[in-house]
């Protein structure tokens, strides 16, 4: 069985599917960054925000989605660019089981801040958790006040 991730890309869309592991998460992150550079031609600052927040969603798949499974699962990254609306949407999904973390003190150094990071970096963050899996959708406007955005 081939464990290498699969990729489909065009100027408006990117789809990547692979094992929910750290190596694949890194490869999906690199593919997303290249796609953003080539297809969207956005500023480095906006790209960095997108890649950082999507990396957090990928890391959550790796760390949490299949924790109670005996087999390694998969994750999917789907990105789209709407030039008319000047927006980018990226969804990361898995078929695992998401468990809301127990509340922790805000100053607890072990507290996860990933969801807050995604919410801060994206213009809109939606997390849909179902028994059949979890999908995180992150939406960004490319018409930010960043003067280097093309």
Language model region names:
Residues 65-70:
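A short, flexible helix-to-loop-to-beta junction within the catalytic ATP-binding CA
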């Amino acid at each position: 069985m081939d464990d290498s991730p699969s990729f489909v890309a065009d100027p408006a869309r990117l789809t990547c599917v692979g094992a929910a592991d750290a190596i694949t998460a890194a490869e999906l992150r690199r593919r997303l960054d290249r796609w953003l550079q080539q297809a969207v031609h956005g500023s480095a600052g906006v790209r960095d925000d997108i890649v950082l927040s999507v990396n957090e969603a990928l890391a959550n798949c790796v760390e949490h989605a299949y924790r109670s499974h005996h087999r390694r699962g998969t994750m999917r990254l789907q990105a789209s660019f709407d030039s008319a609306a000047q927006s980018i949407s990226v969804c990361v999904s898995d078929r695992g089981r998401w468990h809301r973390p127990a509340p922790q003190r805000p100053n607890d150094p072990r507290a996860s801040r990933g969801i807050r990071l995604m919410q801060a970096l994206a213009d809109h963050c939606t997390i849909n958790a179902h028994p059949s899996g979890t999908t995180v959708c992150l939406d960004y406007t490319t018409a930010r006040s960043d003067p280097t955005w093309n």
